[in-house]
C-alpha cells in the first residue's frame, strides 16, 4: 500500500495554485475509485489578475509578436501591480511561446552578442532568454519541470502548460501548519516520528505487509495573490500548433 506523501501532495496543490489560481483536494479513497471526480474535500481559489489574450492580440501581419505584447501589457499593469521579479512557466510553454516568437531572433540579436550563434542553431537556454528579457525590461524566466505520482498511480505534471505566472518576488508565501490530531491522541500501538512542518511519519506492519503513513495538517498561504498576474495562453497555443 502506498500513500502519497504529504510534501508530494502539497507540491501538486501549490503548483496548481501558482499556474491556475485554483486547486482541489480530494478524498484519497474516493479519488482511487472515481478517478478524482467525487468527494472534493477542499477547493481553493486565489484572486489573481487573469489575462487571456486572443490571437489578434499577439499575431501581427502573420507573425507571432508575443514578446512585444507581453512588454506592452506589463507596462500598462505597472501602475496598479508594480514591477514583477520573475515569470514562471513550463519548458513546453517556453519553447512554444518565447522561442517560438517571431521577434526573438529578429530583434534581439544585439542583446545576445556572442551568443547569437546559439540562436541560429536553436540552442537557446532559459537563462540566455532571461538575459534578453531583463535587457529589455521584462522579468527573468524560471522554468518549472516537476512531476509527482498521485494516489491513483498516475504521474501528474505539477505546473500547467500554456500558462505564465508573474510573481512580485521570489518569496511566494508560507506553508502554514497545525499540530496533527494524532500527535495528542495517537493510534494505539503506533509510533510516530516527527518531521518538518509538524508532519508525523508512522511505519508499521501487519499480516498483509509493511506500511508507511504520513500525517500533516498544512495549507499554503500565497503572499499578495491580488498582485500576481497569470496569462492563460491556451488560445494562442492552439493557433500556433494548428
Language-model-detected regions and their locations in the chain:
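A generic, well-ordered mixed alpha/beta core segment in the N-terminal half of proteins
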Residues: 1-6
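Histidine (H) residue identity feature
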Residues: 7, 75, 177-178
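Sequence/fold signature of self-assembling virion shell proteins
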Residues: 42-53, 57-62, 103-242
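An acidic- and aromatic-residue-enriched active-site/binding cleft used to recognize and process polar
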Residues: 7, 18, 92
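Extended, solvent-exposed, turn-rich assembly/linker loops in the middle of proteins
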Residues: 29-120
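A broad, structure-centric signal for solvent-exposed, well-ordered loop/edge residues
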Residues: 25-26, 96, 150
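Short, glycine/acidic-rich hinge or "gate" loops at secondary-structure transitions
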Residues: 12-30
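Intrinsically disordered or highly flexible coil/loop and linker segments, enriched in small
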Residues: 8-15, 83
Amino acid at each position: 500500500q502506498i500513500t502519497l506523501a504529504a510534501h508530494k501532495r502539497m507540491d501538486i496543490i501549490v503548483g496548481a495554485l501558482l499556474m491556475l489560481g485554483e486547486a482541489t483536494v480530494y478524498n484519497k479513497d474516493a479519488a482511487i475509485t472515481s478517478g478524482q471526480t467525487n468527494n472534493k474535500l477542499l477547493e481553493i481559489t486565489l484572486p489573481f489578475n487573469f489575462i487571456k489574450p486572443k490571437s489578434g492580440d499577439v499575431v501581427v501581419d502573420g507573425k507571432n509578436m508575443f514578446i512585444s505584447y507581453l512588454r506592452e501589457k506589463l507596462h500598462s499593469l505597472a501602475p496598479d501591480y508594480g514591477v514583477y521579479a520573475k515569470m514562471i512557466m513550463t519548458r513546453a510553454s517556453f519553447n512554444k511561446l518565447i522561442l517560438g516568437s517571431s521577434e526573438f531572433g529578429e530583434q534581439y540579436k544585439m542583446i545576445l552578442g556572442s551568443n547569437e550563434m546559439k540562436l541560429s542553431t536553436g540552442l537557446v537556454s532559459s537563462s540566455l532568454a532571461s538575459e534578453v528579457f531583463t535587457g529589455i525590461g521584462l522579468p527573468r524566466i524560471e522554468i518549472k519541470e516537476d512531476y509527482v505520482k498521485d494516489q491513483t498511480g498516475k504521474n501528474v505534471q505539477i505546473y500547467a502548460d500554456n500558462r505564465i505566472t508573474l510573481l512580485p518576488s521570489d518569496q511566494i508565501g508560507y506553508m502554514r501548519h497545525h499540530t496533527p490530531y494524532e500527535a495528542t491522541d495517537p493510534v494505539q500501538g503506533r509510533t510516530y516520528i516527527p518531521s518538518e512542518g509538524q508532519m508525523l511519519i508512522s511505519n508499521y506492519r501487519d499480516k498483509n505487509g509493511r506500511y508507511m503513513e504520513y500525517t500533516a495538517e498544512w495549507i499554503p498561504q500565497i503572499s499578495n495573490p491580488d498582485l500576481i498576474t497569470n496569462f492563460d495562453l491556451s488560445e494562442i497555443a492552439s493557433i500556433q500548433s494548428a
